[in-house]
C-alpha cells in the first residue's frame, strides 16, 4: 500500500468517527488501518479536535486507559440549539396546530429528518455522562426522535 497522506487519514478518521457516534476507536485500530505511528495519529486527532471545536461540529474526546482511544460525540453548540428550539416552539404555538380534544398536530415536524436529527442530538447531549444502555419512547410518534437520540448515544 502506498503511503497514506495526512489529508486522506483525516478524511477517513472523520468518516469512521462520525459514522459511529460515541463508539471508542483505539489508536491501534487506526494504526493498523493506515500503517502509521500512534504519535502521527495523535496529531491527526488533535487537528480534528481543533477543527470540530472551531466550527461547532461536535466533540472529539480522547479516552485514556486500557480501553481508551478516541470517540466522536455529536453536539450542537448551545447558541444554535437554543435558536433551533425557539424556532420549533414558535412553530408549535401556531393556532392551526391545535386539534380537537386539545391535541397538537406534530406529524409534519416529526417526519422531517433534519429537525428530528437535531432534536435527537440535543436530547442525547443531556445524557452522555449517564451512559444509558437504551432509549425508550412512550408513544409511536416519539420513535424517530428516540432513534436519533439512540444513534448519538
State what each model feature region is.
Residues 2-9, 14, 21-46, 50-153:
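PRPP-associated nucleotide enzymes
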